[in-house]
Amino acid sequence: MELVRIQKFIAESGLCSRRAAELAIVAGEVYVNGQKAELGQKVEPGTDKVTVRGKAIRAQAQPKLALVMHKPRGVVCSNSDPHAEQTIFDLLPREWARLRLFCAGRLDKDSEGLVILTSDGDLANKLMHPSNLVVKRYYVSLEEPFPAGRLRQLLRGVVIEGEHLKVERANLVNPDTSRSSTELDVHMHHGKKREIRQLFTALGFQVRRLRRYQIGSLRLKGIPLRGVKQLSSKEIQSLFVVPVAHYREMTPSTHDEN
């Protein structure tokens, strides 16, 4: 059988994304035939014994597919969380619940909107790797009005615990006569855990609601709350399309599409 890189083998087993597999290898959590694995090491599926955190990994013949879900608030993006009342995988229809899927770009428990689930480790890696431009758009609702004069602060960002948190674009939605609004349209290419919430909090604003309504050119519209659909090849490609609106000023009337 053809030798494959160990991070690819782990990702294709459905355990996690390739990036997560690489991190596990670097952390010393992956072993091949009882020996600590090295990044880039090749293994022979079906012959070499690979374990991750003590769990044996086997190559699985499962279809490569990608799903998109309209995640509701209160649901955790995790394959297993002993403290969570409900995870995003609990919402899957039976036909997909049996597959080993993982999130390619999570949303925190209090946020809602588009989440990509996939069994394709290569796709997940492509979606999450910082070298790829994947534009994510968010509707942000605040407890208090945000003035237009402070939008540049969102673009410059802030440094919290050594990490630079920022957005690529930010526009007010339905600004009032004083050029302020409690609603914003925000674009990001990356997205660390709770980054948008932390950024607004650092600037003195409390996020009331956060919804990811677009990834690339794939929009939330038409997908009901808790709804799941399989993405076609064309729709998968659309995740990597940079929307025209990303390059120009926008004055959207609403992003409450569902």
Question: Which stretches of residues belong to each language-model region?
Answer:
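Basic, flexible Lys/Arg- and Gly-enriched helix-loop patches that mediate nucleic-acid binding at interfaces
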Residues: 1-258
